[in-house]
């Protein structure tokens, strides 16, 4: 009878217990490799051939960063103007040196007929320049009268504006009245320039002031008559203008 210990000669003892064995993915892969069989996983998808549309040429040109807008559209659009078509800056501001020169010549020559279309414009470039020049010449003569010059100019324009609206059939704007009275202030600037070099408090100064007042009032009334079509009323318009320019003459002489 064979001895049972005879069968234990070729074995060694270990702590491995067959009941504690758990299936693992490595073991399944190992057995799969051995037997040439592998179970398909749930995440794997059967590969499908690419659709033939992917190999067709696309209409997209490959211009990634080019804006979608068309420059030809903006260049042909009538709402977009180029710099060549824009008016000059002086024209946009309403400054016309040709008209300023014509108005100045009209004031300097009281006998010259005035152009009503030009004189009816609201141009304040020349009047502001002449008001500043009058104040500067008075300052050079030792008379700081800027406040009086600007104050009497504003009040005088309001009075003449109200008077002309009552006398004329067609109304006149305040800017037009201020423009005409300001341009006709040029002879008064010449009188104040003479006061810088010699005193006007005498017979010569008084006669010069009366001449300048007549000059300014006749020029202003001539322009108003031409612009407002008030024939035969020049003396009625010249009288209030003479009162206004008389105040400026008093500032200049005294």
From Swiss-Prot:
Pfam families referenced in this protein's UniProt entry, alphabetically: Yip1
On the tree of life, the source organism's domain of life is Eukaryota
Compartmental location: Endoplasmic reticulum membrane; Golgi apparatus, cis-Golgi network membrane; Golgi apparatus, trans-Golgi network membrane
Predominant cellular place of this UniProt entry's protein = endoplasmic reticulum
Question: Which segments sit on the Lumenal face?
Answer: 145, 201-209
State the name under which the record lists this protein: Protein YIPF7
Any idea which UniProt keywords this protein has? Endoplasmic reticulum, Golgi apparatus, Membrane, Transmembrane, Transmembrane helix
Q: Where are the transmembrane segments?
A: 124-144, 146-166, 180-200, 210-230, 234-254
Q: Has UniProt tagged this entry with the keyword Iron? A: no
- Give an example GO biological process: Golgi organization
The family line of this record is: Belongs to the YIP1 family.
List the source organism: Mus musculus (Mouse)
Q: Which GO terms describe its cellular component?
A: cis-Golgi network; endoplasmic reticulum membrane; endoplasmic reticulum-Golgi intermediate compartment
Tissue expression, as annotated, is: Specifically expressed in the heart.
Pull the Cytoplasmic topological domain ranges from the record: 1-123, 167-179, 231-233
Membrane disposition? Multi-pass membrane protein
